[in-house]
Amino acid sequence: MTVDRFYIHGPTPLSGEVNISGAKNSALPILFATLLTEEPVEIFNVPKLKDIDVTIKLLTQLGAKVDHCDVVFVDTSSVNTCCASYDLVKSMRASIWALGPLVARFGEGKIWLPGGCSIGKRLVDLHVNGLEQLGATIILEEEYVTASVNGRLHGAHIIMDKISVGATVTIMSAAALAEGVTIIDNAAREPEIVDTANFLIMLGTNINGAGSNRITIEGAQKLGGGKYSIMPDRIETGTFLVAAAVSRTNVVCLGSRPDTLRFVIKKLRESGADINMGKDWIGLNMHGKRPKAVTVCTKPYPGFPTDMQAQFTLLNIVSKGKGKIIETIFENRFMHVPELVRMGARIKILNNMIVCHGVDSLIGTQVMATDLRASASLVLAGCIAEGLTIVDCVYHIDRGYDHIEKKLRNMGAHIKRVTNK
């Protein structure tokens, strides 16, 4: 097995222009939603990511024809199995998004759970509860979940126990082919939900309310094909804005959506950043000033995104003063903290909160990437740290950032990928 590392020599200021890629959290559910139609679909602005590669392999394994170049062409008319391979599913929990479209169109779907553990079961509870209310029969075993229905799924009024982006996608996608009207209350409001809904509308579903906490879906008997372009990735945008903020420099994020990052922009302005924006770009300039520490509390959209928490941890540890990060969405999402402490950060963990005391500089060392967003914060930390930083297990970052080392090099970083066998 090969393991990639990043070797980063710092400190180097990061500045310039960066082109923002398509949103991973839109691209994945939209690719799985192509299973709802037997008509061909062309999808533009799909990011080049490991999770996208796995999704395309999974669709191909189910029998779909997929051509993946600059544009992704998907034809699922030849799908001949409703069971997703464990070897593919185990590496990506987002594969649960195949279940709703499979049972909605073919009457059956079987998805192996990642790792086949109790944690996996808890992760799919909201998904399967929603499908059950749409009329699916669910068999939930230790290693897999099967959904089946005689005839079509039927519309339902579903009140979600808690806000969940993933479960909202599953229910909305399955309801696209259900008989009658489905109402989702307490739905997730993320821009990626709106993007997925717009794709389903393009296929022929009637959807209202996406982006609010109540979504209404009028199911169609059959869906068509068409062309669709994925929205820009707001988390990638936020990551590069933080890159310039911690470097005390400037950046322009081209092909972005400022309207999806209001809370992030608000907090960056609180830190002292000068921010300008247009319809499809955001510019940040620190004018050489050290940032001021801020307090953020993660919330479902439109609140501060949990996927920006690790990046703002980095911002706080190199800022003036004391800042707090409060995590309310996920447990155990502070795994980047011990790695940053090894680089000289002053951080204290208090239950679901971390308190950061700003330091003048960080010191390069060898660190371990533990998850997607944590790995991004460690890479940025390496860019501004004194000396050599080695980031292990960068496959995490390949899951969610399109050619991050190339984009950082264009901004001035001294970063190299090394493959160890």
UniProtKB/Swiss-Prot annotation:
Subcellular location: Cytoplasm
Record's GO cellular component terms: cytoplasm
Keyword Cell wall biogenesis/degradation: yes
Binding site for UDP-N-acetyl-alpha-D-glucosamine: 93, 307, 329
InterPro entries per UniProt: Enolpyruvate_Tfrase_dom, Enolpyruvate_Tfrase_sf, MurA_subfamily, RNA3'P_cycl/enolpyr_Trfase_a/b, UDP_GlcNAc_COvinyl_MurA
Swiss-Prot/TrEMBL catalytic activity: phosphoenolpyruvate + UDP-N-acetyl-alpha-D-glucosamine = UDP-N-acetyl-3-O-(1-carboxyvinyl)-alpha-D-glucosamine + phosphate
This enzyme's EC code(s): 2.5.1.7
Active site annotation, chain numbering: 117
Pfam families (UniProt xref): EPSP_synthase
UniProt modified residues of type 2-(S-cysteinyl)pyruvic acid O-phosphothioketal: 117
Predominant subcellular localization, coarse grouping: cytoplasm
GO biological process terms on file: cell division; cell wall organization; peptidoglycan biosynthetic process; regulation of cell shape; UDP-N-acetylgalactosamine biosynthetic process
Keyword field contains Mitochondrion: no
Binding site for phosphoenolpyruvate: 24-25
Pathway of action: Cell wall biogenesis; peptidoglycan biosynthesis
Keywords: Cell cycle, Cell division, Cell shape, Cell wall biogenesis/degradation, Cytoplasm, Peptidoglycan synthesis, Pyruvate, Transferase
Family membership noted in the UniProt record: Belongs to the EPSP synthase family. MurA subfamily.
Biological role: Cell wall formation. Adds enolpyruvyl to UDP-N-acetylglucosamine.
HAMAP family on file: MurA (MF_00111)
The protein's name in its UniProt record: UDP-N-acetylglucosamine 1-carboxyvinyltransferase
UniProt organism field: Blochmanniella pennsylvanica (strain BPEN)
